[in-house]
Amino acid sequence: MLISISLATLPILAFSWASFIEPNWLRTTAIPWRLPKKHAHLHGLRIAQISDLHFHKRVPEKFLNKVSKSIKNFSPDLIVFCGDLLCRARLEDKERLETFLNTLEAPLGVFAILGNHDYSSYISRNTKGEITCIPEEKSRPIQRAIIAVMQGLFSSPSYRYDPNLTPQEPHPDLLKLLKNTPLTLLHNTTHVIPNTLNIVGLGDLFARQFHPEQAFKNYDPSLPGLLLSHNPDGITRLQQYPGDFVLSGHSHGPQVTLSWPKFARKFFERLSGLENPYLARGYFVTKEGKQLYVNRGLGGLKRIRFCSPPEICYITCSYD
């Protein structure tokens, strides 16, 4: 009898944890960035990476304060945001969002790129599995989620675009808001910090705005390169370009996952919708030597997380 009651309460406890505890359980990850000795002057440079805020009215103020306090305590030289400030291309409660963004300060600057939620339309997969604009009235999130599960298990993970999808423009109201904050938007461009490093910001893959041939025009090959690509699949399209460390988000970990057993982890990775599902979270090094860190992000379409708490990544440079 007691065993039956215990088993019956497990789903309730798991749902409560995933809905109310873990989405607010902010974690930090420390990553070293080892540079050649010729860049020894960058030893100790500190970078904070955040991603996927998906800001909306229901994001708790207490959580935003946690993020701000953690970053302030780390005292970074540089802050980067890897896309998806907005949720479904909606700018809600913009005064509160602006207030939060104005808490992000760093001596070398705060830089941001756009994600698939940050353009004039929300871009994701439709019920046919094609990447396209998703009108709010036709969002059908439950139906699309079920179809995504089926496609993730039985279909090729390669991206299929709606043939009518044209390159999307950045969200105009978001651009206006960013001008009132410390954030510098990098959209297919490179910002060179003299005698320090290149920061390359790519447009989003889903938005058909990923243009590295344009982004690297101003790149200084004598300096290390930090590359910002919202979608981690971007790294497969960057191998012929310079740069040492790629920072991404997009997949959220995924938000609900299991790290064990292995087949369960593989199952949830497929549900991330990536072309390369193994890139759903964590640190990687390509055979060409590029490093990649995929951040689990801060938020999501729904504030539900299980075995994938929200994250800030702290990177410290050193030399070999």
Swiss-Prot record:
Membrane-topology annotation of the record: Single-pass membrane protein
Major location (coarse): membrane
SUPFAM superfamilies reported for this sequence: Metallo-dependent phosphatases (SSF56300)
Binding site for a divalent metal cation 2: 84, 116, 250
Transmembrane segments: 1-21
EC number: 3.6.1.-
Annotated a divalent metal cation 1 binding sites: 52, 54, 84, 252
Gene Ontology MF terms: metal ion binding; UDP-2,3-diacylglucosamine hydrolase activity
InterPro entries: Calcineurin-like_PHP_ApaH (IPR004843), Metallo-depent_PP-like (IPR029052), Metallophosphoesterase_sf (IPR051158)
Cofactor: Mn(2+)
PANTHER family named among the record's database cross-references: PHOSPHODIESTERASE YAEI, TRANSMEMBRANE PROTEIN WITH METALLOPHOSPHOESTERASE DOMAIN-RELATED
Family: Belongs to the metallophosphoesterase superfamily.
Protein name per the record: UDP-2,3-diacylglucosamine pyrophosphatase LpxG
Origin species: Chlamydia pneumoniae
GN (gene name): lpxG
